[in-house]
Amino acid sequence: MQIQTPDWVKHAVFYQIFPDRFARSKQPRKRLLHEARWEDWEAMPTLQGYKGGDLWGIIEGLDYIQSLGINAIYFTPIFQSASNHRYHTHDYYQVDPLLGGNEAFKELLEAAHQKNIKVVLDGVFNHSSRGFFFFHDVLENGPQSPWVNWFKIHGWPLSPYNGEFPANYEGWADNRALPVFNHDNPEVKEYIMEIAEYWIKLGIDGWRLDVPFEIKTPGFWQEFRDRVKAINPDAYIVGEVWGDSREWLDGTQFDGVMNYLFAGPTIAFTAGDRVVLEQVQSRDYQPYPPLFAAEYAAKIQELLQLYPWEIQLTQLNLLASHDTARLMTIAGGDKASVELSTLLLLTFPGAPSIYYGDEVGLPGAIDPDSRRGFPLEANWDREILKTHRQLIEIRHQYPAMRTGDYQVLYA
């Protein structure tokens, strides 16, 4: 079988945006809440607080994003939710009103496409939330609800909030706030497929899939790919899988995964013994122990042999994300480590992804600190920003940086 992946991804430089933290619109008339109790933009973020970033603010920031050389944006979830990260989905067809709703998203999509910037959304299809209408109906009506078989319920009554009693349903990572879908139910599968199709038809350029390894239903992701690609053959499907992903990268499911197998050894090599271990030891990737050059080369060659070359070229390579500490903090503030890591990222086969703010030296410990508000211009690190712009320009200038062979040379 000949593996086919979207050609545009091979030439993309992604920018990952956490929508609540990139920018508040400068046009208050477009905000749903004018007197909202937002957290101070520059204050340290909290687990539950909102800072009030919105899609209008991102539209206003597209010129800056384009000036970096970015031509694709991956958004963490934007759908209606009761959490600042929006992984607790209430409505898969409604962009969160706090972000500007569907109106703002349609305007953002059009504005991004006018600048030749692709848009990839985060699909949280393993689980929903306590506020998801179908689950809420189960809470209200118990065994009589028509949606009972949409979830993995083991007994009655359900206890969605009181931890003194058994939940009696499966929540992702044992979290009662995140009821897991019953993907073996054909109605659930069809519902998710139709969500994916709806937003692709609206014009998005792909899906990043949250914890897709949790969905065990045979053929689920194969059908997902078939139905998405039937609408847009160039749609990008990328999974959040932290380790060996050969199971999903056989050409019938995902075009790539978030390449933490690149991030770990790259940081271990560039930051070495400067890596702040408490920022990485509880994570699902390993930027430690320190690696010497020959050891790093061996790790990278092993990684490049793991998947077909067509897949390597559409991996989503990264150094940090909303699920990790930021590189500046992991490296103990060492700018040389940050710049060397960025050099390796932007010269590696696959699509590089820059986590918003990393290009200006934004620090941040593990969640929630890694989700700070985008810094004021006065606080930007101009040297790191210059490094990013130069390397992105070089990557765009030379095709070999994007699709050429990768060889290790020994001095």
Q: Which residues does each PLM region occupy?
A:
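Aromatic- and acidic-residue-enriched segments that line the glycan-binding/catalytic groove
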Residues: 6, 26-38, 84-96, 125-164, ...
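Conserved, mostly hydrophobic/aromatic
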Residues: 17, 65, 75, 92, ...
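Aromatic/acidic polysaccharide-binding cleft in carbohydrate-active enzymes
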Residues: 20, 32-33, 251-256, 277, ...
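Active-site-adjacent "subsite" loops/lids of carbohydrate-active enzymes
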Residues: 129-202, 210-213
